[in-house]
A protein has these predicted regions:
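Non-heme di-metal
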Residues: 2-214
């Protein structure tokens, strides 16, 4: 990535404030969706589906932190508008996941997700708008595939139909985020940025595996 000096960020957007928030504070800041459709209790779901949903919750939690990391660092008005809009959507997703997945069913790695998510947003923001857009495209490309793998295992009819629809709706938002980022990103990227995006993709895959197990 070609380094450019970031423009001054608003005094209120201090990185420490975002990193120091507890998991509960992050969850409480998300809008209360109240929109999760009726579905079987989490404990009654198949084990594989519980694990997938645990990774989904962790992913939405991490997504909130990615955009907070961007907003904490970037002073670019277009980047901030982009991140703020996406953040609101990710907060809604997180609120939905909080309704579906009880605290006992969530990964114990959320403190790590908080830090790593924030850094995934903050680091590219140091290098400018193109690094941010490329990063989001990489993240959302992975998320699209991750949701699709779950959706194809669930049928629209039956007891898991409402839950499947939640995943379909979340996936549609993530695809929209990916496409928007791709439309704003330049197709030609230097070696460092390509490597960074590869790390982001592989890191996302590793995070899913960890969230399912811990």
């Amino acid at each position: 990535m070609t380094s450019t000096a970031p423009t001054a960020r608003p005094p209120s957007a201090q990185p420490q404030a975002f990193v120091a928030q507890t998991d509960e504070q992050i969850a409480s800041s998300a809008p209360q969706a109240g929109l999760a459709p009726a579905a079987p209790a989490f404990g009654g779901l198949p084990r594989w589906l519980q694990q997938e949903l645990r990774s989904d919750h962790a992913g939405e939690f991490g997504a909130v932190m990615i955009y907070r990391g961007i907003l904490a660092i970037s002073g670019d008005a277009s980047v901030r508008e982009f991140a703020d809009s996406h953040l609101r959507t990710e907060q809604k997703h997180l609120a939905l996941m909080e309704e579906i997945i009880p605290p006992a069913g969530r990964t114990r790695l959320l403190p790590l997700w908080r830090l790593m998510g924030w850094l995934t947003g903050a680091l590219p923001a140091l290098f400018g708008r193109q690094a941010v857009f490329a990063t989001i495209e990489a993240v959302e490309t992975f998320v699209d595939h991750h949701y699709q793998q779950q959706i194809v295992r669930l049928t629209p009819e039956g007891e898991h139909g409402p839950l499947r629809q939640v995943l379909v709706d979340c996936q549609a938002d993530e695809v929209s985020h990916r496409d928007e980022a791709a439309s704003l990103a330049l197709p030609k990227r230097n070696v460092i940025l390509r490597l960074w995006c590869a790390v982001v993709g592989s890191g996302s895959a590793a995070a899913v595996v960890a969230a399912k197990r811990v």
